[in-house]
């Protein structure tokens, strides 16, 4: 787990446990460090470093194009923030569900 994810562990836990409307409000006011931490989590899930259930994989497969943009290091943080605000609900809940056990250990 990266230092960025450790610094933002409390916010990641809050994003995982709150409703979609609350997630959207938190993401709109999020700092770039939190956006990058979320993208780090997504990168770890996409590349298989963090195991997730097959049910979560099928849900994330529907958002394949958005996931590619969020995990691309060439895309700016502002663009990633806009993508997360627009498509964030399902992506964040499913991806952070996979790393919840790691976050709870912090």
Description of each model-found segment:
Residues 1-31, 35:
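N-terminal leader/propeptide segments of preproteins
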Residues 2-3, 59-60, 97:
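General helical secondary-structure elements
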Residues 5-8, 80-106:
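Short, cationic, amphipathic peptide segments
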Residues 11, 23, 38, 60-63, ...:
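Generic structural signal of hydrophobic/aromatic residues within well-ordered alpha-helices
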């Amino acid at each position: 787990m990266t230092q960025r994810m450790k610094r933002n562990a409390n916010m990641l836990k809050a994003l995982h446990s709150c409703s979609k409307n609350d997630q959207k409000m938190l993401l709109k006011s999020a700092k770039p460090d939190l956006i990058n931490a979320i993208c780090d989590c997504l990168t770890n899930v996409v590349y298989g470093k963090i195991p997730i259930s097959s049910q979560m994989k099928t849900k994330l497969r529907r958002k394949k194009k958005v996931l590619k943009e969020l995990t691309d290091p060439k895309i700016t943080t502002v663009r990633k923030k806009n993508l997360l605000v627009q498509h964030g609900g399902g992506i964040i809940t499913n991806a952070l569900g996979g790393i919840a056990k790691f976050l709870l250990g912090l």
